[in-house]
From Swiss-Prot:
This is Probable pyruvoyl-dependent arginine decarboxylase. The modification Pyruvic acid (Ser) is found at residue 43. It is an enzyme of class 4 (lyase). Its cofactor is pyruvate.
Length: 181
């Protein structure tokens, strides 16, 4: 059986509860994907895959459905501990080629820091497969310009969720790319 996703939507959530597993469930609910049996997959953005809204994507899901997703996930039970989770995306200009999705789930990084890092990871993976020359020691903004000016990478972005731990509770953050037929 061959399954290449034709649609993708991006969602994120945060959950807090005294139990670790329950905080994850609440993060899934916040992201509106709790009714699915999620199967995490590695990080290829399929050729000709269309990005759709969360609302459109949710209409295509049924309770109990086996659903493939690239998921970044992080959790803490430490008070004031900053956690984040991000999925970065890099899409080639040629829609018959595949792109990349990357997961990043650090401690102590803001939405912006975490998101830029995840986006940089995805764009760098794509750039290396497309033969784009770049200096890995340059900062992300400079490399992003090089990638996009090459004409081979058309778009990159990220979806990121961060939160601080609350006293006595588990806090879980997730960011997901949900892949659909």
């Amino acid at each position: 059986m061959s399954f290449v996703p034709t649609k993708v939507f991006f969602t994120k959530g945060v959950g807090r509860h005294k139990e670790y597993l329950s905080s994850f469930e609440l993060a899934l609910r916040d992201a509106k994907i709790e009714k699915c049996n999620l199967v995490t997959v590695s990080s290829i953005f399929p050729p000709k895959c269309e990005r759709i809204s969360v609302e459109e994507g949710l209409k295509l899901l049924s309770p109990g459905q086996i659903t493939f997703a690239v998921m970044a996930r992080n959790a803490t039970n430490e008070y004031n501990r900053l956690i984040s989770a991000s999925v970065g995306v890099a899409i080639p200009a040629d829609d018959t080629q595949y792109g990349y999705l990357s997961e990043h789930h650090p401690y102590g990084e803001s939405d912006e820091q975490c998101g830029e890092y995840a986006e940089d990871l995805a764009a760098t993976m794509l750039a290396t497969t497309l033969g784009i020359e770049f200096d890995p020691n340059k900062d992300w903004d400079e490399r992003e310009g090089i990638y996009k000016m090459s004409g081979k990478i058309i778009n990159s972005y990220n979806i990121t969720q961060s939160a601080e731990g609350e006293n006595g509770l588990w806090t879980t953050v997730i960011s997901c790319a949900v892949l659909l037929p």
